[in-house]
Structure formats: C-alpha cells, structure tokens
C-alpha cells in the first residue's frame, strides 16, 4: 500500500494558537478555558471540539494557572511559554571521512613458565 502525503494543516500549531489567544484577550487576571476556545474558534478555521484535548494538554504543560483548578481556572502565559524566534538554521558540519581501520593485529601469546608450587612446611 502506498503512503499518502498528509496535507499541511490549515492552521498554526495549537501551542501558538493558545498563546496568541491568551495574549490577545489581554485579561488582567488570566483567561478562562472557554474564552481561549472562543478566541481560537473566532480567529482560526478549526474545529475546537477536535482540538480540545490538545489545547488542554498544552495549557497543563506550558501555561501558568492563576486561579482555580482544572478547566474552571484562569490561565496566563508563562514567560518561558512565549514562542521565541528561531535562530538562523545552522549549517551542517562537513562529515569527517573515516579512515578504514586496519585489521587488528593478533597478539601472540608468549610461552609462560608454569607456576611452581611452594612447599609450606
């Protein structure tokens, strides 16, 4: 069976959508889960019901909760969660040409003298 190429998503990643929603709402004490979902539904062409688990997962991991517990709380953007501009792509380093290893030399075992037992009387 041939693999089909998946179509590129028509929306940005959930992480960026949630962060822009929280920043766009500009609520002083943080934005609620419902408000974040409404903002995403209004500004992006997505099915929020399908993205709900991903939104919840991102909020748990990257966003600071200011009030309440779970979905009933308010959320603010963590300073670390704000997406930073990516640095210029690094050029891949030239691969070093490995020299073929010479065959390992076999060690010849020297003839050893047999150990003599000491008489302990």
From Swiss-Prot:
SMART domains from the UniProt entry: H15
GO CC annotation, single: nucleosome
One MF term in the entry's GO annotations: double-stranded DNA binding
Alphabetized PROSITE patterns for the sequence: H15
Compositionally biased tracts (Basic residues): 82-121
Region (Disordered): 64-121
UniProt subcellular location: Nucleus; Chromosome
A Pfam family annotated for this UniProt entry: Linker_histone
GO biological process, one term: nucleosome assembly
Free-text function comment from the UniProt entry: Histones H1 are necessary for the condensation of nucleosome chains into higher-order structures.
The protein's name in its UniProt record: Histone H1A, sperm
Species of the source: Platynereis dumerilii
């Amino acid at each position: 069976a041939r693999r089909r190429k998946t179509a590129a998503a028509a929306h940005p990643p959930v992480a960026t959508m949630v962060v822009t929603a929280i920043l766009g709402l500009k609520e002083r004490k943080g934005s609620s889960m419902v408000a974040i979902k409404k903002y995403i539904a209004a500004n992006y062409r997505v099915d929020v019901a399908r993205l709900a688990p991903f939104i919840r997962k991102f909020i748990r991991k990257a966003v600071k909760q200011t009030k309440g517990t779970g979905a009933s709380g308010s959320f603010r953007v963590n300073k670390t969660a704000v997406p930073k501009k990516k640095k210029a792509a690094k050029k891949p380093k030239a691969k070093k040409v490995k020299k073929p290893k010479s065959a390992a030399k076999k060690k010849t075992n020297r003839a050893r003298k047999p150990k003599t037992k000491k008489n302990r009387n």
